[in-house]
Amino acid sequence: MLPFCFEMTSMSYIGRFAPSPSGPLHFGSLIAALGSYFQAKSQHGQWLVRIEDLDPPREMPGAADLILKTLETYHLFWDGEVVYQSQRHHLYQAQIDHWLQSGQAYYCQCSRKQIKEMGGYYNGHCQELHLDAGAIRLKMTQPITHFDDLRHGQMHIPLELAQEDFIIKRRDGLFAYNLAVVLDDIDQGVTEVVRGADLIEPTGRQISLYHMLGQVPVRYLHLPLAMDKNGNKLSKQNHATGIDLTHPASMILEAMAFLGFAIPKELHQANLDEILRWGVQNWRLNQLPESLEITARFSNGTA
């Protein structure tokens, strides 16, 4: 359970877009932003923006401001204040302290080499050693082996992964993504998460965290991913090019086509607000590609 009470909002739709400031928004980021925006606005809901700046060594100076400027240039205006994870460490640490005190979490000093020798999954080696330093792991008492995706139906998580005591704070002192994102989504009242299919695997762990925190999990929708011409997922780690700030309408239309919209010819003459309004009105989950494979559509190097 939680060590303190979150201030929960009403159960009307609240979605979010949560980029990391490791570089500018690229075409793959635009797909995630648009998908989450259309899903929220088509249900007359709120669309929040959160900057997930948990990993300073990977961050690019000025990237957070550039991301927000890009969203504004594309007229993807968010509701409420932008939340920065770097300003919420107290929230994460309070929950970790609670779990350490209750015995639900423990310190671990196993190396990656040792875990590889265990078969690739951590086997709880340090659970009863009562260490006082190292990474912090959560005792997994509520493993999740499947969940329902709003477009793709039941998704399965490998049992070994679901049962693993995973890290909630790294040995270098940085907080783990899974813990931070769940605590933030609860705190912000998020009801549904729309994001790329590359985040399907951690979804099971995040749902486990909801249960262990005594909270009702959010709903999940995973979107198709864009690839570059070499067959790699468009990502900041793969040095994907930032999206063009001078022709946002054409980029929006390209991303909408990727998301399965049948774009009428007259929409190519519309302004940005008209395009987005049409997108909200015509957004349907069944238009999304069925395959969970990374798709090479629109991977011709334009983004």
Swiss-Prot record:
Note on how the cofactor is bound: Binds 1 zinc ion per subunit.
Motif 'HIGH' region, residue range(s) on this chain: 19-29
Entry's EC annotation: 6.1.1.-
Residue positions binding Zn(2+): 108, 110, 122, 126
Positions annotated to bind ATP: 236
Cellular component, GO, one term: cytosol
Binding positions for L-glutamate per the UniProt entry: 16-20, 52, 177, 195
Cofactor: Zn(2+)
Pfam family, one: tRNA-synt_1c
UniProtKB keywords: Aminoacyl-tRNA synthetase, ATP-binding, Ligase, Metal-binding, Nucleotide-binding, Zinc
Family under the similarity heading: Belongs to the class-I aminoacyl-tRNA synthetase family. GluQ subfamily.
Function: Catalyzes the tRNA-independent activation of glutamate in presence of ATP and the subsequent transfer of glutamate onto a tRNA(Asp). Glutamate is transferred on the 2-amino-5-(4,5-dihydroxy-2-cyclopenten-1-yl) moiety of the queuosine in the wobble position of the QUC anticodon.
Protein name: Glutamyl-Q tRNA(Asp) synthetase
